[in-house]
């Protein structure tokens, strides 16, 4: 209830998309995942859709339960965590817009290795609704220059 009030205030202040980070979803036991992850997320998604705000859900760590989550919760987009195989996601979540997936640790590797991983995601999801992003947050020592190169790579990808 309070979360929806906060989201409504964000929408009224100009937010045009809402992202729900369910950071602990992967730690919820299977027996209670439906009641303690799917249903609360579904209520928030329904509220956002009533307010005409698209919703991206990030149920971190639920692994191959992403499909079940997506079918029940019905977000506009799913943010993949870095443990999800991108080919599995493309094959099994093909009816959904997807975001993310790349391991943030890749950003500490050589430029060639980074670009290889970026290109992998962009190639796999080339013909599907996909938003390039990481599969988790930036790590504290990530070099901003590396991020600029990644952004340039994404923007210039053909």
Where would I find each of the regions flagged by the language model?
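Active-site loop segments of alpha/beta catalytic cores
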Residues: 1-158
């Amino acid at each position: 209830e309070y979360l929806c009030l906060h989201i409504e205030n964000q929408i009224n202040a100009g937010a045009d998309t809402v992202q729900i980070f369910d950071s602990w979803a992967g730690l919820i036991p299977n027996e209670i995942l439906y009641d303690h992850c799917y249903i609360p997320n579904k209520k928030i998604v329904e509220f956002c859709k009533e307010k005409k705000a698209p919703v991206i859900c990030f149920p971190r760590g639920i692994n191959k339960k992403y499909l079940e989550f997506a079918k029940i919760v019905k977000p506009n987009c799913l943010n993949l965590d870095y443990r999800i195989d991108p080919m599995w996601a493309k094959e099994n979540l093909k009816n959904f817009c997807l975001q993310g997936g790349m391991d943030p640790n890749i950003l500490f590797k050589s430029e060639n290795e980074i670009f290889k991983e970026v290109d992998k995601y962009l190639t796999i999801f080339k013909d599907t609704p996909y938003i390039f992003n990481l599969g988790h947050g930036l790590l504290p020592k990530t070099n901003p220059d590396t991020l600029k190169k990644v952004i340039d790579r994404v923007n210039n990808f053909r």
